[in-house]
Amino acid sequence: MLENHKTKLVLFDLDGTLIDTAPDFLTSLNNVLNKYGKKNVTAQEIRNHISEGSSKLIKFFFEIDYEHEDFEKYKSDFLSEYKKNLNKKSKLFEGMPDLLDYLDEHSIMYGIVTNKFFEYTDPLVNSFPELKNIKIIICPDHVKTSKPDPEGILLACNKLNIRPEETIYLGDHPNDLKAGLSAGTKIIGCLYGYSLEKNSNELFDCHFVEEVSEIISKID
């Protein structure tokens, strides 16, 4: 007999929570850095900055400010490169297919609320057959204010007619957890991702997991 859950909806952040997109970010950024004679970066270096967005990636790794005359050119080149590479090496985090199967078996809906624009999110998600049962995708294109504002999470809940208190939001960045808390959902911090520190449990009163396989036991 299947266990009955109070949770009706699980919402995922995308980069660093649902999908490990770091390899394709690394390829794309290094291609542009090489183009302009800049030093390559390592996988670990870029993992620490993926969740900050493309503008901050360019600012940090090109070591320029936003007003630099070539900033927009570098950013445009990076985004073009990323669009070509976004589903080449990216993969679901280990254990994620089993988690999604569990949610399907228990009739728990799941979706994505991300700060990644739909132009990049849609082809990435569609390249994974395991994500065919995703019920909703909310990107910055769909809201006035992105995370840490709760608007995207609340929009997803509203569209699926699920109350926030029946929802879990999973993320790997402090802004994800802030958004979930503000929306009134339960939250789970994903330490296997890119941006949460090991001491995050001192800042947020919620469950934390170091592996995807730990998530099922946290679904009430």
Model region roles, listed by residue range:
Residues 49, 113-115, 170:
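Structural motif
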